[in-house]
């Protein structure tokens, strides 16, 4: 590992093959990503994928920062937390 490069410490992936999935990972530089997707209104004209997730990272100040998000038919909707 070179200075400034991160490696994946943990990783999980699950996909049911029908549009629903979960995945996540954690890296050596403190980045954590969790995400899940589900098909809403499946089989209708209003069918849409809804994705929810969280991205957390360690700031240069040593504090954790996070973005929780939803992405669906209404677009990408992030919420920042500290």
UniProtKB/Swiss-Prot annotation:
One GO MF annotation is: structural constituent of chitin-based larval cuticle
Which cellular components does GO assign to this protein?
chitin-based extracellular matrix
Q: Which UniProt keywords apply?
A: Cuticle, Pyrrolidone carboxylic acid
Q: Which residues form the Chitin-binding type R&R domain?
A: 18-82
- InterPro entries linked to this entry: CHIT_BIND_RR_consensus, Cuticle_Struct_Prot, Insect_cuticle
In the record, Pyrrolidone carboxylic acid modifications are located at 1
Q: Which Pfam families match?
A: Chitin_bind_4
As given in the record, the signal peptide range reads none
Q: What does this protein do?
A: Component of the abdominal endocuticle.
Q: What is this protein called?
A: Endocuticle structural protein SgAbd-6
